[in-house]
Each structure stands twice: as structure tokens, then as C-alpha cells.
Amino acid sequence: MSAARAPRAHVPEVVWHDVECGAYAEDLPLWRDLATIHGGPVLDVGAGTGRVTLHVAARGYEVVALDRSPALLAALRERATGLPVQTVAADARDFDLPGRRFGLILVPMQTAQLFGGPEGRAAFLRCAAAVLAPGGLLAIAIADALETFDEVRCMPPMPDIREIDGIVYASRPVSVHEEPDGAVIRRIRETVDTTGHRTVEEDLIRLDHLDPATLEAEGAAAGFRVDRARAIPETDEYVGSTVVMLRG
């Protein structure tokens, strides 16, 4: 369990994003290495509260953080004081950054699997192509196959836990089940405050089925050149990822 100061006065969207995503670090060395090779400016797609943006910007690279959530970006701006960071509130499938070109575009974690299938990915690739500099790199992480489970038939993973100003936040994955075009992850979110008051709510997230070969083919159809993919290993807490590399 880690203690931290309250982000954005306990805005629930910010807190749960930090609890469920903020501790993941296995991919950071790759993003850092790519920034070293390609330089800035860097576009971070699905930036959230800045897990990747802050890591890259702290090494001196200009980063534009794009996310559709104003609340998450507000928290990011607070944390980015003194760093070369700009935020843009927009949907990754429908954004325009006039006059901007990026040598590196990053799409970390499973962001690309939230685009809503082939049409959503095609829309994103069109937007990305419009802002990627000639010879630049678009690096897209997709999760390796998720194993289905439920809490009745097997032991679920350990919860993600964080304490903020005496309030304990816990997010526990309780099932992953398959649908025709994706996988649905069900979590139970619980809080316990300093008086012992407890809240419980359910959260569902749907990830599109997507494999590297499919994404590479979609990238080629959108006019990108396909480079060798990179692997991010799994950990005890997180599945591994494959990072598809597309060049402008």
C-alpha cells in the first residue's frame, strides 16, 4: 500500500485512474529509449494523469499529452509544473493539431483497444498520420492475450490499493470474460474512510480483440511502413504487451 497526497481534491475519476494504472512501469524504459532515439516533440495518446508523459518530459523532451478526460488532464498539469508539457483534451479518433508534427507518437498500455474496433482504429490512424513527421514513429502497445477467469472458479488477482489522506481505495479485478469482439474486465472498487464508512461500486471496461498482425495490416493500409515489433514482458501483476511500430 502506498500513501499519497490527494490528487484534485479526491476527484473520483483521477483517484481510480491512479489506483488502477499509475503503478505500471514495465513499459517506461521502452518509451524513454524511443524518445532518446527520436527526440521531441512527443505525442502521448491516452495520457491520463501523466504516467508516461511525466516520465518522458522529466528527461527534457517536449510532450503533448492527449486525452479525452479534462479531469485527468487537469491532474496531469498540476503534476507537470516546470516540465515541457502541453495538454490537449480530445478523442484520439477525432483530433487535429494544426501546424504540429511529432517525431514520436506513443499509445501506451491498451489504449488502442478502447477505440471501438476497426473503424475506430482507422479513424485514429488517419489522425496520427496527419501529425506524424516524415520518418517519425508511431508506437502502439496492445495487450497479449488475456486469460478469462471469475472469482467463483479461481482466485482473482490481488487488488490495487492506495491510501490518500486516510481514505483507502481498493480496486479488485473479479472477472475477465470473452465477448465476440473483445474481452470485458469487471472490477469492484471499494473505499474505506477514516470513520470506517465503506463504499462499493462496480466498474466494467471492454477491450477490443486485437493482435499485432491485424494492427500492422491496418497500419500498412493507412500508409505507414511496418517496423519490427517490440515486446514488453509480463509481470506478476500485469500481462505482457506487444508494441507495434509504424513509420510515417
Q: Can you say where each PLM-predicted feature lies in the sequence?
A:
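Conserved SAM-binding loop of SAM-dependent methyltransferases across substrates and taxa
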Residues: T49-Y61
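Conserved SAM/SAH-binding beta-strand->alpha-helix loop
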Residues: S69-A71
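Conserved SAM-binding strand-loop segment of SAM-dependent methyltransferases
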Residues: G82-D94
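A short glycine-rich, Lys/Arg-flanked "PGG" loop and its adjoining helix->strand segment in the class I
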Residues: A122-P134
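SAM-dependent methyltransferase
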Residues: A139-A213
